[in-house]
């Protein structure tokens, strides 16, 4: 009798589950629904970063002379940071030559308005169109040190007409690592939302070796997933991915930015 009761209870439970699945359960989550769900959860008010500019190409020497700069140097690299846009756009390796037959040092980064423009920018964006934020044309001011070394960081600031100050502290280790700390000082009586960003800008695709065990192109680790995108792949189709943590860069035969 107990066995019959157990079987009857199981059968009744199964019937209830089946009926609920048919009439009350939500539809299965498709890829399209999942994408829309993620979009809603992340919010649609986050601003996008779009600072595409048409620039007239000039020589490296002329480009470097067009804006005031902060010089940096340690035992491994030498270069400068442009106060226009606070861009790291001038970097030369002190210990690496272009070739075995040349004394010319390898130049990795170059100003935006050169043929091989290659630079690093960081800053903030906001959804409030009435707030002025620093962009690639903004002129930053320095305070304290005006030369960056592995022993002395530099501080930059830019203040808009609304009374909001944007600050950067840039430090350098004894090799190749820059660290940028950013903060905002809001002297107004209003609250604003800002989103920090960092980006690497490269004007053109460099010469690549096409060696099958070597990746040259975009490189990232996002949410613990390694991602490698070749230059030709992103020319054919744009690549986009959302993550909560990670890092990204551009890899060449010998260097990673």
Stretches found by the model and what they are:
Residues 13, 23-111:
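Juxtamembrane extramembrane loops of integral membrane proteins
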Residues 2-30, 132, 137-138, 172-174, ...:
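Internal alpha-helical transmembrane segments
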Residues 1-4, 41, 62-65, 143-146:
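Aromatic/His-enriched, Gly/Pro-containing loop or helix-boundary segments
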Residues 69, 73-257:
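Soluble non-transmembrane domains of integral membrane proteins
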Residues 2, 35-37, 127, 166:
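Generic N-terminal leader/processing signal
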């Amino acid at each position: 009798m107990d066995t019959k009761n157990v079987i009857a209870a199981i059968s009744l439970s199964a019937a209830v589950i089946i009926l609920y699945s048919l009439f009350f359960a939500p539809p299965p989550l498709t890829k399209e629904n999942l994408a829309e769900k993620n979009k809603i959860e992340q919010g649609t008010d986050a601003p996008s970063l779009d600072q595409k500019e048409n620039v007239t190409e000039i020589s490296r020497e002329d480009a470097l002379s067009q804006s005031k700069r902060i010089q940096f140097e340690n035992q491994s690299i030498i270069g400068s940071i442009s106060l226009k846009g606070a861009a790291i756009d001038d970097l030369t390796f002190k210990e690496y030559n272009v070739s075995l037959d040349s004394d010319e040092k390898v130049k990795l980064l170059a100003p935006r308005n050169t043929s091989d423009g290659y630079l690093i920018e960081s800053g903030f964006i906001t959804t409030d169109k009435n707030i002025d934020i620093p962009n690639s044309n903004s002129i930053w001011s320095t305070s304290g040190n005006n030369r960056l070394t592995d022993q002395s960081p530099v501080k930059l600031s830019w203040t808009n007409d609304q009374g909001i100050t944007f600050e950067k502290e840039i430090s350098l280790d004894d090799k190749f690592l820059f660290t940028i700390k950013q903060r905002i000082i809001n002297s107004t009586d209003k609250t604003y939302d800002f989103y920090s960003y960092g980006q690497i800008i490269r004007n053109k695709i460099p010469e690549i070796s096409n060696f099958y065990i070597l990746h040259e192109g975009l490189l990232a680790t996002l949410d613990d997933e390694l991602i490698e995108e070749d230059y030709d792949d992103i020319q054919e189709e744009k690549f986009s991915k959302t993550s909560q943590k990670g890092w990204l860069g551009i890899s060449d035969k010998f260097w990673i930015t």
